[in-house]
Amino acid sequence: MKNILSIQSHVVFGHAGNSAAEFPMRRMGVNVWPLNTVQFSNHTQYGHWTGCVMPASHLTDIVQGIADIDRLKDCDAVLSGYIGSPEQGSHILAAVAQVKQANPDAWYFCDPVMGHPEKGCIVAPGVAEFFCNEALPASDMIAPNLLELEQLSGERVENVEQAVQVARSLCARGPKVVLVKHLSRAGYHADCFEMLLVTADDAWHICRPLVDFGKRQPVGVGDLTSGLLLVNLLKGEPLDKALEHVTAAVYEVMLKTQEMGEYELQVVAAQETIVTPICQFTAVRL
């Protein structure tokens, strides 16, 4: 069984970061070692929260503890998401290096959460620069949304073709796989949710219907998406099939959340369809 060290945020109430991704990843049949970068009462889109950012040294201490019992060699991938400070980022990269020393075949999957003030996603100063300058070249896989893709590349992206080109430019700087996990205004269709999966040689596009939640969209969709893609790839799924499963599984969670009249992702209620989605979508090679 594969093992993932998941270094992300944690909320006590609701679903974001590890609280959104950990259970679905486990449900897909992998072990998850959750290491929390922050512990908040709830996610920041509520506009009010309590809790704390973990000291950067806490991350290193925990990873060293696993090394001390000689189990880092069993780690197949490190997944990082929301970080509370750029100092945490440096410690995460040190942890990645330590894992790869113990297991040279281990992957680093970076979800570069850079903040989106309009959506209430707030990150500390210096975090975006950390992702652009340090995490990108260290990653094997990276999963930006459109805004983050533009920040990582320093280029404006207006359409799918440009998104593919810019994603390939990121591949030249480090990662082998780039998931653009929300094309937004650069997509083909205004009424669809679209994603791209890009490598140096291939590009796959997929779309699904939007799920309308009104003015306030659920948080944690990107965390769920990244976690499920990593699981699929670790299990050896081809890129297109991995993208298809992730798209369908996340859509099922969104539908269940809407059906239940909830705002927080209903990952437990949707667990069966995360594993075996009812809806199906086809990835198209570009």
Swiss-Prot record:
Belongs to the pyridoxine kinase family. PdxY subfamily. Its EC number is 2.7.1.35. InterPro entries: PM/HMP-P_kinase-1, PyrdxlKinase, Pyridoxal_kinase_PdxY, Ribokinase-like. It is an enzyme of class 2 (transferase). It catalyses: pyridoxal + ATP = pyridoxal 5'-phosphate + ADP + H(+). One of its GO terms (cellular component) is cytosol. ATP binds at D111, A143, E148, K181, R208, P209, L210, V211. Homodimer. This is Pyridoxal kinase PdxY.
